[in-house]
């Protein structure tokens, strides 16, 4: 597929994949993007998932017009992008492999070969001239692996962005970018906001007209929109006004409290996203918890702790540096409710977390006193 006169798309899509990275549901499949620049010298950018190696090499061959590549540029070593490096090297024996020093160490671990006789090690600011096109390499460590680099092509103002600006879904899926890009970001990159911010600062110094990520669609217009969202996400800012309610309920009493709270909040005209953690896709609940500025957690005391799905959810937030949010708590316990205390303690190392003064404490079923507490909590969480 032609991107520009000299830049072509040679990636593939897995439309049958159910779980990306073994945990993220991908109902629209997954794209593994790869690119080639055709110039005096030919550079290929990244490979694809192992099971698509032959299809990818065919895509490449169809764009080469009988020529052979001079370089394979490896921006990211995660196996969904690097699995076919050795296969490429076997087919194109004269091609040089270009990547960071850390990436070559990973190649030794994955393939038993650092390609010492045919490698070019690059670092921040290094350049690779292809003829009309020149690549400048930019370090992007921990976005989201330590070896990551991105590449800027100056003549056509292209940023080859590795996993940054990626999203779930096959390449040709027509869907709102932000939804699945947000879920991808907070699921996979979210822990590394500082590092993503560092990359954005470097990108701000470049004149970029197109962003070419390793997952999802090419970003070719209105780049300020995408850059703005990435800035909000990576700085742990609030994207939209609203409240996320995440809950678990054993016999329906905690769920009843959640429904009452949702009604009270919606009366004020505020958006509410509700997730039953035992049944929902956890990554969507995590996405909403970061999208909105307010979060209510509702669960039962369980084995002198909290219900396992809630524990997992809180862990998913805190390990991604959840911060700058207001949290409300609802607990339920038939004889010794301790869930609120445990949930509050789980955020003790999180930055800029404000807890609502009212904690709804249910002992068994929702009482009239609880209903009054719920009305108070609704006012506090949106205030």
What do these predicted regions represent?
Residues 144, 148, 164-191, 234-239:
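Active-site-proximal loop/helix segment associated with metal-binding centers of metalloenzymes
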Residues 84, 281-285:
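Short acidic active-site motifs
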Residues 51-98:
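Active-site metal-binding motif and surrounding structural segment of the metallo-beta-lactamase
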Residues 212-239:
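Short N-terminal or domain-adjacent regulatory/targeting segments
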Residues 171-211, 215-218, 260-275, 285-383:
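FMN-binding flavodoxin-like domain, especially the glycine-rich phosphate-binding loop
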Residues 45-47, 69-77, 97-100, 159-163, ...:
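Active-site neighborhood of phospho(di)ester-bond hydrolases with catalytic His/Asp-centered motifs
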Residues 2-61, 150-153, 157-161, 254:
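Conserved beta-strand hairpin/beta-sheet module of binuclear metal-dependent hydrolase folds
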Residues 2-5, 99-148, 192-198:
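Metallo-beta-lactamase
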């Amino acid at each position: 597929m032609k991107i520009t006169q000299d830049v072509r798309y040679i990636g593939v899509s897995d439309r049958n994949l159910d779980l990306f990275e073994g945990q993220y549901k991908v109902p629209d499949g997954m794209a593994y993007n790869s690119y080639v620049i055709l110039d005096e010298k030919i550079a290929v950018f990244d490979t694809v998932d192992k099971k698509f190696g032959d299809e990818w090499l065919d895509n490449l061959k169809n764009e080469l017009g009988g020529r052979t590549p001079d370089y394979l540029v490896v921006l990211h070593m995660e196996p969904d992008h690097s699995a076919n490096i050795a296969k490429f090297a076997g087919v194109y024996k004269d091609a040089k492999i270009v990547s960071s020093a850390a990436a070559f160490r990973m190649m030794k671990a994955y393939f038993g070969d650092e390609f010492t006789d045919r490698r070019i090690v690059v670092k921040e600011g290094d350049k690779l001239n292809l003829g009309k096109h020149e690549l400048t390499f930019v370090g992007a460590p921990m976005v989201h692996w330590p070896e990551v680099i991105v590449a800027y092509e100056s003549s056509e103002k292209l940023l080859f962005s590795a996993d940054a600006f990626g999203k779930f879904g096959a390449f040709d899926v027509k869907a709102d970018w932000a939804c699945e890009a947000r879920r991808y970001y907070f699921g996979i990159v979210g822990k590394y906001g500082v590092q993503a911010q560092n990359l954005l600062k470097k990108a701000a110094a470049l004149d970029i007209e197109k962003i070419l990520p390793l997952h999802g669609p090419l970003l070719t217009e209105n780049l300020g929109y995408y850059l703005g969202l990435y800035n909000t996400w990576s700085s742990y800012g609030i994207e939209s006004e609203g409240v996320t309610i995440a809950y678990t309920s054993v016999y329906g009493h905690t769920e009843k409290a959640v429904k009452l709270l949702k009604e009270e909040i919606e009366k004020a005209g505020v958006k509410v996203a509700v997730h039953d953690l035992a049944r929902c896709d956890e990554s969507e609940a995590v996405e909403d918890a970061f999208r909105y500025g307010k979060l209510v957690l509702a669960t039962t005391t369980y084995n002198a702790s909290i219900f396992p799905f809630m524990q997992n959810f809180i862990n998913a937030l805190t390990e991604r540096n959840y911060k700058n949010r207001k949290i409300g708590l609802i607990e339920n316990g038939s004889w010794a409710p301790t869930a609120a205390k445990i949930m509050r303690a789980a955020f003790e190392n999180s930055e800029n977390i404000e807890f609502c003064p009212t904690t709804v404490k249910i002992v068994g079923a929702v009482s009239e006193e609880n209903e009054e507490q719920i009305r108070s909590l609704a006012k506090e969480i949106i205030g």
